[in-house]
Design a protein with these regions (language model features):
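Small side chains
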Residues: 14-15, 43-44, 81, 87, ...
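Short coil/turn motifs at beta-sheet boundaries
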Residues: 38-40, 62-64, 105, 145, ...
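Cleavable N-terminal export/targeting peptides
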Residues: 1-42
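Short glycine/proline- and aromatic-enriched beta-strand/turn motifs that initiate or cap beta-hairpins
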Residues: 26-97, 283-285
Length: 286
């Protein structure tokens, strides 16, 4: 086995070890646990690979594979809502960005949020949560820091088409704002399979526009912001009560004409104004 394959296997094993650790919280009706919690707790973890890395801010950061791990935990407070915390790690699997950051675990992102699910009927409810997002950028060679941001998300869940929006606003830079809006429609063709097709837009701020694409006298979209469209789907196949295989396909396209024009003039990763990204992984829920 080559050193690269060994490194990839270690990253995947690390994510699965985290999932196994979280499984200690899983309820087993046949066994009596040595501790108890005052409220129901659920969560999970997933380790996966993607063919490229598309930033949540709406830009293509890599065109080579990356390894990612994510874990989350949710405390159900009953009539008082719920608490949610999650964390995400990313590692590059190639030298495409060695000049920017190290390869293994170069970035961590986590959130701590409070949420409330307002039910209108059994099938229609408004799920809202918000809190703080924290980034650790210690793996970057020239951009060390721990930015803090406001993070909020809302879904109007219903049987037909679920609209949603998501806001990220950094405290250290009032211009650094990202807004995602979209619609999705989860469905299950069979009991063990869940598919969520979606389409969304990502509105980026003027500061990131200039940093990624450069200055242009022609941009007029939202005072210099840019917009990216994303369409795709997420699929899960649950092969045991708790374990599942995960797959994601995304196709992004830069909408703003000024951004498309500037991107095509640059000999960088972001010169791609349209790109397809595939992801495959293994997850666990409790």
């Amino acid at each position: 086995m080559s050193p690269r394959m060994v490194r990839h296997a270690k990253l995947l094993a690390g994510g699965l070890a985290l999932a196994s650790l979280l499984s200690a919280f899983a309820e087993d009706p046949e066994e009596e646990r040595w501790f108890s919690l005052p409220f129901p707790v659920s969560g999970g973890a997933r380790a996966y690979f993607e063919s490229a890395y598309f930033s949540s801010s709406g830009t293509l950061s890599y065109t080579k594979p990356v390894a990612e791990q994510v874990a989350w935990i949710n405390a159900d407070l009953g009539d008082y809502g719920y608490l949610l915390a999650d964390g995400w790690l990313c590692s590059a699997l190639n030298g495409q960005t060695d000049h920017v950051h190290r390869r293994a675990f170069y970035c961590f992102e986590g959130t701590a949020r409070y949420g409330y699910d307002l039910k209108f009927t059994d099938d229609i409810h408004l799920d809202t949560n918000g809190g703080l997002l924290w980034d650790w950028l210690g793996g970057y060679r020239a951009h060390h820091g721990t930015p803090l941001a406001i993070y909020a998300m809302q879904h109007l869940r219903n049987p037909i088409l679920t609209p949603y929006w998501n806001l990220l606003h950094r405290f250290d830079d009032n211009r650094y704002v990202r807004i995602r809006t979209g619609v999705e429609h989860p469905f299950s063709p069979i009991e063990s399979v869940k598919i969520v097709p979606y389409i969304e837009s990502i509105w980026g701020d003027a500061a990131r526009y200039r940093r990624v694409y450069g200055d242009s006298p022609s941009y007029r979209f939202l005072n210099g912001a840019y917009m990216v469209g994303v369409t795709g789907f997420v699929a899960e196949w649950r092969f045991t009560e708790r374990w599942y295989l995960w797959f994601r396909f995304r196709q992004f396209f830069t909408v703003n004409p000024a951004a498309r024009s500037l991107a095509k003039q640059r000999d960088t990763i972001v010169h791609h104004t349209d790109y397809s990204i595939y992801g495959l992984g293994l997850g666990f829920r409790f």
